[in-house]
């Protein structure tokens, strides 16, 4: 027992040891495994894989890699695959160069892919371990690289593949039917052979394809241009682009779409832009002239694809638009009707607005170009501000005649578009004031609402300073109505008589209304003069310290006129009268609507039958220019308005000419409006000169005010900076020239508002 105990005490604890898996294999055994795998790979390549055990093959490959023979396996695989592709596949493809080449190559490619998938599955462990550790291509990619280098990129195969694909596409472009599937398969193969890149596809197919396409389209463009009009050419280019996109979609890799479309655009559009837009009898100008909105839209769509395409279109459109605009605003022909002048511009704007909307997708570049062109030619004619005001005057006087309020509103909105293009807005304001005054004083406005609406548009555009005087005119009219009500009440209360004269006086604030600097003289006939004196006393009694000055050129009168002579036909027989009130056999009564000057002239003939021009001038004291205009209206106007006759019967009026009442005057209308000659043609040259002088005087003050405002704020400024700032501030009303600004600066220096700095005479300081 003691021995057992001793024995037990001396025994140590033991651990179970597992012997490591032997890391070395007999070379003979390794070779035998490799021979087995090599044979299997070759059988797979020959499509004889049905008798193979993939599990056994996988285990053998696993064993080789595990025992550090991965390199032998990998190298062996490369050699076996290379040998098969060189000796079998390449030979088959070479033998098919002239017979079913693409089909043979495609079949070889499909077989190779299938084989490589199977081989990859067998060698999966090598892919996971050896390939990863040694940073080499995986099994499948190795197969692709060998196929690429030994088959697809082998000398004549590579060239033949490229040429075959290019020939097929060239034939299809000419209308032949080709095997699109074969092209697609070849392109897909080239993309896969690039190993997630485009290099193989790009070098072996796409680059030569684009080069060939460029040559083809270059020749096609010459043919298209020689045989077709611009619109047909554009349609053919569109069709070509769509055809190329469709070909890419069905045959090539989708990445080729962008480059091939760029080639088409470059060869068929970019290189021929000017030729297309300038085509005689079919280019851009032809389309604009003939309102071809659809063709223009096609051109716009096509040209928007290429750099500078829209710019080229815009330049051509601009040349045509400026030519059209200059023809409309040219100063040729003094008798240009202002309403027609502006309507022509509005029609032109309407046409190009339609092109902008329907053809040019409201493109900003086209919009700016059209606006710039209108601004350019509208301001070529110095009469544009006056004519625009006369156009608005015509619409606000005659708006009801055949036009609804909405239509008038729409026309005024269009007129405002032209107003925005106008540089001399201050000139427009002066004329608008004159024409508004005439409408208000002769009760010719279509409605106060329309007038105020127009002023509101101007206010929105230019601010309240622009319209303050116009609004003041409306206030004066309202106050005058109240004053006249009070005056009539005063006459009733006092029993004072105006001697049969129905008098209406409008008291106008000098600063608001377009009064003339020197009021034209006129010897008002006694009856109306007496009536006015009664009003003057009444008004000044209420408003002491004020002055009333008659503005004869702004007044009007309704005269009761009686004509006694028989009315004769051309054959000399006498006729009855339709429109006039007839008393007795031949006496006719009319109400003549005339100006104050015309009234003064006509009332002379209550005293005598005949007057010479000099006599009328002496009696009335009307300035010669106004007198000639009034007499032309009365004696040389329309036959239905000639209440005076003149000897000799010429349109010119000279000192010795004799005037008498036209006793044969008749009209279908009881109330006859005597139009002032040339009133609708705008001002005469002397009047225009006077208006321009007034505008220039006003501008001097505005420029000086702007200079003082700026200098007061900045204290010190360099000349060019000040000129730029003044121009910026005033451009909403007019564009002052740098020369005029300089003169005004010098004027302010003389008057000691500004001073030059001693160190630099081109720098000014504000003198507080």
Swiss-Prot record:
InterPro entries: Cullin, Cullin_CS, Cullin_homology, Cullin_homology_sf, Cullin_N, Cullin_neddylation_domain, Cullin_repeat-like_dom_sf, WH-like_DNA-bd_sf. It comes from the Eukaryota. Component of multiple BCR (BTB-CUL3-RBX1) E3 ubiquitin-protein ligase complexes formed of cul3, rbx1 and a variable BTB domain-containing protein acting as both, adapter to cullin and substrate recognition subunit. Interacts with btbd6. It comes from Xenopus tropicalis (Western clawed frog). Pathway: Protein modification; protein ubiquitination. Belongs to the cullin family. Residues 682-698 have a biased composition (Basic and acidic residues). Residues 698-760 form the Cullin neddylation domain. Probable core component of cullin-based SCF-like E3 ubiquitin-protein ligase complexes which mediate the ubiquitination and subsequent proteasomal degradation of target proteins. The E3 ubiquitin-protein ligase activity of the complex is dependent on the neddylation of the cullin subunit. Involved in ER-Golgi transport by regulating the size of COPII coats, thereby playing a key role in collagen export, which is required for embryonic stem (ES) cells division. May play a role in the regulation of mittotic entry via ubiquitination of aurka. Coiled coil: none annotated. Gene3D superfamilies: Cullin Repeats, Cullin, Chain C, Domain 2, Winged helix-like DNA-binding domain superfamily/Winged helix DNA-binding domain. One of its GO terms (cellular component) is polar microtubule. The gene is cul3. This is Cullin-3. Residues 677-698 are annotated as: Disordered.
